[in-house]
UniProtKB/Swiss-Prot annotation:
The gene is TEX2. Heme binds at residue 449. The keyword Membrane applies. This is Tabersonine 6,7-epoxidase isoform 2. Pfam families: p450 (PF00067). It catalyses: (-)-tabersonine + reduced [NADPH--hemoprotein reductase] + O2 = lochnericine + oxidized [NADPH--hemoprotein reductase] + H2O + H(+). Its cofactor is heme. Keywords: Alkaloid metabolism, Endoplasmic reticulum, Glycoprotein, Heme, Iron, Membrane, Metal-binding, Monooxygenase, Oxidoreductase, Transmembrane, Transmembrane helix. It is a single-pass membrane protein.
Amino acid sequence: MEFVVSPFAFLIFFFILLKMIAKNFKNPKKNTKPLPPGPKKLPIIGNLHQLGGGLAHHILRDLSQNYGPLMHLKIGELSTIVISSTEMAKQVFKVHDIHFSNRPSHILVFKIVSYDYKDIVLSQYGNYWRELRKVCNLHLLSPNRVQSFRFIREDSVLNMMKSISSNEGKVVNLSEMILSLIYGITARAAFGVWSKRHEEFIRLESEIQRLATTFVLADMFPSIKILGALSGLRYKVEKVHKKVDEILEDILKEHRNNNISIEKEEEEEEENNGGKKDLVDVLLDIQKNGEMETPFTDQHIKAIIFDMFSAGTLTSTIAVDWAMAEMMKNPRVMKRAQEEVRNVYNGIGNVNESKLDELKYLQAIIKETLRIHPGTPIVHRETREECEINGYRIPAKARVMVNAWAISRDPNYWPDPDSFKPERFLGSEVDFKGTHFEYTPFGAGRRICPGISYAIANIQLPLAQLLYHFDWKLAGGMKPEELDMAEILGTAAQRKEDLLLIPNSHSCSSLKQQV
């Protein structure tokens, strides 16, 4: 067979080569301290060829075992630092946190869907980001605000339990049900109501998540602007995002019409207990009252709302799915968890949030799930300026990948790290707050996830209800040891196969009287 190179592909390759040669002439190498060790780089593509054919966090872990916990890669033209140990994570998240406080820029999909980085997750470190963080801590995701969504959580989870109960003895796709549940909770918290249009919004958001996993050459060579313009992905993302934007525009318009002013007694209620406002109301109030020193347009509000769905739902959805899968694979853990929740809520017939703090073993299960299966296995940062770690030079504008998945399976800190053992967290001081660098499922430092309490609230109650009301069997007579625990990596690390289970109501459940 004759191998033919298209003229267009050759021109692109030739253009990249000329661009990189010109860049090297413009920025000649200086006699500086060395970069961290790493595998040899090929011309133009660097180490790009070594990152294909598997899950990135697995590949990076394997490379770090040869080149060390502080490793340098070249991904296209991007200088990339990979962190794979607790000690190096501390350097990034604490010692040099200010130097590593940016998020990666010039990512095609994220640039479009975040309205040019106007959201919380992807905005660059500076005055605007600091103001957004303050808004999150005081208004959007404060303890009072999260508590104000308690009715939404309890009502939504109870409805899912009723749906499962109506299918007792039949196979249910628990993965799909969990996804629908968490999206529904977030939609009601953000928009105040649930409608068919919000279902369309969720479908579009899922499509963007899928597109975000596509390999984009322009992301590897951001200095070559023509690559982004020529990318077929740009058209697809812009087409989907246009529909998302239309829905968000309608939502903002409706909220403005329905909630022009707030009476004084409502303001007092807002201050005392989180009020009845949804998140769109809160953002519109901030805009109307001029509480931001930096510009705060409708685009900023829409970017933040989209954040709530993309970042605010995936972690909880994936964690509940993984936790149930791990308990199905480890019947000993399932049995102990069911006994705990049924004892704590004995005689009540249902589970609410009043006694969740008493479920210590369930809390340990959640922590262990997020250790073995962190929703974001790689925490991404970008350096603001050059710094030095362990005698190595860390360039400015370098991409940084903290392999949280590898660190949380480090046998130096976690005995028998690949086994699911919630008991390791009983009596342990290790928590989600980012101060224990061997365990950072929500990141750490100044850019730690601001929605930890919101995420955990959306994980605890569904799990407690699933454990309380039902005994579970794997579909098709599958044995626990046969359950497929393979993962796929999109914008988060989720199970490859949906979790198909057969529910049977437990005698303590009062659901049958409610269905």
